[in-house]
């Protein structure tokens, strides 16, 4: 899963993806990431820009660092290449900002969960327009939940969902941390 504004390191080893990434590097174009599950491939995904190739291997494999840019919806899939291509439309967020209190609550919950789980994360800027994505992208949350966030076009609704999700998992994390310390 990839969210706008969130970094994602990738190890490219399959021939079809080596071809795709080489083409993206040559043309300086992004590629799309969609969630695949037992139910199929999602219609909503996120474009990824390649920030850098961090390592090249002798056999053609490579490690790259990407960052999510735009949410998109697949309109039509083309299967005439080794890798899938698609006609897409970019998805814009609805106008409006979440209430300040919700932003502060989300940042506070995120910091507590990161601390309890021993995750080293730097707190995202509270003024970020995609705060919900930055928070959800920095923690190992349920993929179905993450996909629901990706589909939601309102930052306020996404942030409300993130707050609800984090509040729901926090008691279990507190119990686990307490048991670890005893």
How would you name each of these model-derived features?
Residues 1-182:
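N-terminal low-complexity, acidic/polar interaction/targeting segments
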């Amino acid at each position: 899963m990839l969210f706008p504004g969130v970094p994602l390191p990738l190890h490219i080893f399959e021939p079809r993806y080596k071809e795709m990434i080489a083409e993206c590097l040559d043309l300086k174009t992004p590629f799309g990431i969609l969630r695949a599950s037992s139910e199929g491939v999602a219609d909503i995904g996120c474009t990824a820009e390649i920030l850098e190739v961090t390592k090249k291997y002798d056999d053609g494999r490579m490690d790259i660092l990407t960052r999510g840019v735009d949410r998109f919806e697949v309109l039509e899939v083309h299967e005439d290449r080794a890798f899938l291509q698609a006609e897409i439309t970019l998805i814009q967020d609805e106008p409006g900002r979440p209430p300040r209190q919700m932003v502060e609550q989300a940042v506070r919950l995120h910091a507590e969960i990161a601390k309890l789980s021993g995750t080293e994360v730097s707190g995202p800027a509270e003024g970020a327009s995609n705060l919900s994505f930055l928070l959800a992208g920095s923690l190992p949350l349920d993929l179905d939940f993450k996909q629901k966030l990706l589909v939601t076009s309102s930052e306020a609704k996404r942030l409300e969902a993130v707050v609800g999700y984090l509040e729901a998992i926090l008691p279990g994390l507190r119990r686990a941390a307490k048991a670890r310390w005893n």
